[in-house]
């Protein structure tokens, strides 16, 4: 049974629904995107997280931006930009938050950079954004899961990129992912989560068997 993160939420009712359905984490985007939320909106959304743990997705945040988000009570910052290992460590010290780093995967070589981030608390392996993309994630593209064959994760990690209710069980079986992250894969209209898809994704992931 894998853990589940539903990312890109911006409606309090949907946040509460995802938490009730069993999402372990609920993610809020603080970067340019159709799913972006403001600090004020996030403060309201946090009231609906229930037992789920909130995660703040940020892209190359300044000190002030990271501190403002952390001050809302987020325990985890997910860095989705070009943050260096030193910058990740700085943000961890500055905010007191756990730090997850998103790593774009296209080839096996991309996994090599993970070892350069000793101070992070978790990893999110996502498909590398398409060339010319203006946002870091939520593209609905998957990477070749066979790249992870024989790989041993040095940190807790989540699989992301192109996951849907239809393929998440296969993805978990193929990679052994202990957790999965979804955004566009549970949307029928871009930027708007669909209850049926959210429920189906969580149930499929929770019912899956890891190798």
Swiss-Prot record:
Catalytic reaction(s) noted: N-(5-phospho-beta-D-ribosyl)anthranilate = 1-(2-carboxyphenylamino)-1-deoxy-D-ribulose 5-phosphate
Matching InterPro entries: Aldolase_TIM, PRAI_dom, RibuloseP-bd_barrel, TrpF_fam
E.C. code: 5.3.1.24
S-S bridge residues: none
Pathway listed: Amino-acid biosynthesis; L-tryptophan biosynthesis; L-tryptophan from chorismate: step 3/5
Magnesium found in the keyword field: no
GO biological process, one term: L-tryptophan biosynthetic process
Keyword entries, A-Z: Amino-acid biosynthesis, Aromatic amino acid biosynthesis, Isomerase, Tryptophan biosynthesis
Enzyme class name: isomerase
GO molecular function: phosphoribosylanthranilate isomerase activity
Family the UniProt entry places it in: Belongs to the TrpF family.
Name of the protein described by the UniProt record: N-(5'-phosphoribosyl)anthranilate isomerase
Gene: trpF
């Amino acid at each position: 049974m894998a853990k589940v993160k539903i990312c890109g939420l911006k409606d309090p009712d949907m946040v509460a629904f995802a938490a009730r359905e069993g999402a372990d984490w609920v993610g809020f985007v603080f970067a340019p995107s159709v799913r972006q939320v403001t600090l004020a909106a996030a403060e309201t959304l946090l009231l609906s997280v229930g037992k789920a743990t909130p995660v703040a997705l940020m892209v190359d945040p300044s000190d002030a931006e990271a501190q403002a988000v952390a001050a809302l009570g987020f325990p985890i910052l997910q860095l989705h930009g070009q943050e260096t290992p030193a910058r990740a460590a700085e943000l961890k010290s500055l905010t007191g938050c756990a730090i997850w780093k998103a790593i774009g995967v296209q080839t096996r070589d991309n996994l090599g950079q993970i070892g350069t981030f000793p101070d992070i608390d978790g990893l999110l392996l996502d498909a590398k954004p398409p060339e010319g993309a203006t946002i870091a994630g939520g593209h609905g593209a998957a990477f070749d899961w066979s790249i992870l064959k024989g790989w041993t994760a040095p940190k807790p990690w989540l699989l992301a990129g192109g996951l849907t209710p239809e393929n998440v069980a296969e993805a978990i079986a193929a990679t052994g992912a202990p957790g999965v992250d979804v955004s566009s894969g549970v949307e029928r209209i871009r930027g708007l989560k669909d209850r049926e898809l959210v429920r189906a994704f969580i149930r499929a992931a929770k019912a899956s068997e890891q190798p």
